[in-house]
A protein has these predicted regions:
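Short hydrophobic alpha-helical segments enriched in small aliphatic residues
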Residues: 3-10, 17, 21
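Conserved beta-strand hairpin/beta-sheet module of binuclear metal-dependent hydrolase folds
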Residues: 9-15, 26-72, 157-175, 192
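Structured catalytic core of nucleotide-sugar glycosyltransferases
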Residues: 34-44, 86-91, 95, 106, ...
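Active-site environment of divalent metal-dependent phosphoester hydrolases
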Residues: 41, 88-92, 114-115, 156, ...
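Active-site metal-binding motif and surrounding structural segment of the metallo-beta-lactamase
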Residues: 62-109
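Metallo-beta-lactamase
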Residues: 110-160, 164-167
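Cap/insert and terminal regions of metallo-dependent hydrolase folds
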Residues: 181-281
Length: 295
């Protein structure tokens, strides 16, 4: 009897083990994303894994960055790079400290690096931490494949970032005056999209800003309005897109509920239901978002 059972187990082992017919679950990489701050007074985003991560922009104070990361159990020693989109103060405030004091490589185009070191808000000028990248050329940082691409904005030079890992595609477009064909390509590739919805058109029109500033914001190299972002998404949303985070909201000309509602209504008009077909979040200016984890 015992011999018979042993024989049966041996046959099963041989068939399933040696002939490799056991179905094994593919190991997937957990990708984490959080917005530490998103708005016209400061921007900083984390994307990474349990072991390491990178920052996209560093436009808030170094102490604030350290505190938010510590609250998440993330040490600065696990940050492999800082990617800078452009040289405006709300994107580079802490980059000198991160690069030169903590030795974290800072990636951007040569023109942006020149702009960073000319900026009044960067007291620690970059030298040993400088890493150049070219738009359209992919670089690799750990398991993250990163491509910078051109976006229209009025900084020295301006890029968005496409970050791919384990089949997951994140596209960051934080400041842009309009959506070009290149920007549209990276938006439509994304599973996870961080896209600007800076201002409500009526709030900007009726607000206290001087006329030249209103024209700059609404111009082709300024910022995206809620309506413009909503219309593009409604006409171009793909089935692969799972999450949309509306970013870089203006303090004076927008608020999260209005941005969310504008996009949600236009998506619904095209038969796309938020919460079912896609997730939609309007990021807050000075408060970290929840930590999102994707496998």
């Amino acid at each position: 009897m015992h011999f018979h059972l042993f024989y049966v187990y041996l046959r099963l082992f041989w068939r399933n083990g040696c002939n490799n017919t056991i179905t094994r679950k593919r190991n997937t990489m957990k990708i984490k994303f959080i917005s530490l701050a998103s708005g016209s007074s400061g921007n900083c985003y984390f994307i990474g894994t349990d072991a390491y991560g990178i920052l996209v922009d560093a436009g808030i104070g170094i102490r604030t960055i350290k505190k938010h990361l510590k609250d998440l159990g993330i040490g600065l020693d696990t940050i492999r790079a800082v990617l800078i989109t452009h040289d405006h103060a709300d994107h580079i405030k802490a980059v000198g400290h991160l690069g030169e004091k903590f030795g974290i490589p800072v990636y951007s185009t040569p023109e942006v690096h020149i702009g960073i070191n000319k900026s009044y808000c960067v007291t620690e000028k970059l030298s040993t931490s400088v890493r150049y990248l070219n738009k359209g050329t992919q670089i690799q940082i750990e398991d993250l494949s990163i491509t910078a691409f051109e976006v229209p904005h009025d900084g020295t030079d301006n890029v968005g970032y496409c970050i791919e890992a384990d089949g997951k595609i994140f596209s960051f477009l934080t400041d842009l005056g309009h959506i070009t064909s290149t920007a549209a390509e990276y938006i439509c590739r994304a599973n996870y999209l961080i896209l600007e919805a800076n201002y409500d058109e009526e709030m900007l029109k009726m607000g206290p800003y001087p006329q030249y500033l209103k024209e700059r914001i609404a111009g082709p190299n300024g910022h995206m309005s809620n309506r413009e972002t909503a219309e593009f998404l409604a006409e171009n949303i793909t089935e692969r897109l799972k999450y949309i985070w509306l970013c870089h909201l203006s303090k004076d000309n927008n608020h999260p509920e209005l941005a969310y509602k504008t996009v949600e209504l236009l998506l619904r008009s095209k038969g796309v239901l938020v919460g079912k077909d896609v997730q939609l979040i309007a990021l807050k200016r000075n408060t970290p978002s929840e930590l999102y984890e994707f496998e």
